[in-house]
Amino acid sequence: MPVLFAAATQNDLQFFNKVATKMEGLIFIYVFANTKWNKLEKELAEICTYVRGNNLIKFQNKINDLIDEEIADAKNNLVDPKYLQENYMKSKFVVHRVDFHIAKTLKLGANIKRDDFTLEHIIPQNSQEGLRKSTPPDTSIDEYSKLIHRIGNMTILSKSSNSSIGDSTPYEKIISYEGGKPQYDGTLIPITKVLIDGNLEVISGKKTAPVKFSNRYDLKKLNLYKDAYWSEDQVKKREKSFFEILSDIYGVNLN
């Protein structure tokens, strides 16, 4: 907070936004690295001095140095199933932050009520029957269940849609349910819609901003393992896309 107060004294919105986003990036890394907050407290005076002096370069360099000290632990925890299961709200932030950035950047979903959004696990989280049906025949259920809490297994749905598909498999959600349309069909939420048809929104043409964004971050429709199963390969590809987006937001390297 003192850093933002210092930035606000400059009466420069662009400067303030750059400082705020960089600080958000530092806090993001500290949260996922489980860094003790007194470490940041010791650096606040120096950070605020750079900000009050309108020295963006020194400020950014200082924050980058602090990030570099912790980023390895953060990156490990971002793909650690046990850590993510025990820190559900951190995972939730990642997915919602990516969704917010896409919507803001591309001006998508202005009519979507985001307070109706909830986190959805593509491999079902709370259904043993759903997990059993989702597991590939050449994989143990215990091993497959480790993917449930990975960030690449997460997307966003409306609360009403999420509550009705608890036992469903990824195939039923993404490809076809009972021979008809998939259960995610009809959603306008970009990171979920792209799973169905490869598009972030209802678009036409190949040079639109959403298509360029999709290509930039490789946000595309993913082929299922053996055309039927959501596997670690799809999870990793989705994580790579999400982490690339976050890397560009915060000016770090999360992949």
Show the residue positions of the predicted features.
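Short intrinsically disordered, low-complexity coil segments enriched in acidic
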Residues: 1-8, 117, 188, 222
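C-terminal, well-folded lobe of enzymatic/effector domains
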Residues: 14-21, 28-31, 35-38, 65-70, ...
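Betabetaalpha-Me/HNH-type nuclease active-site subdomain
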Residues: 52-197, 238-239, 243-246, 250
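A cross-family structural signal marking well-folded subdomains
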Residues: 1-95, 192, 197-199, 203, ...
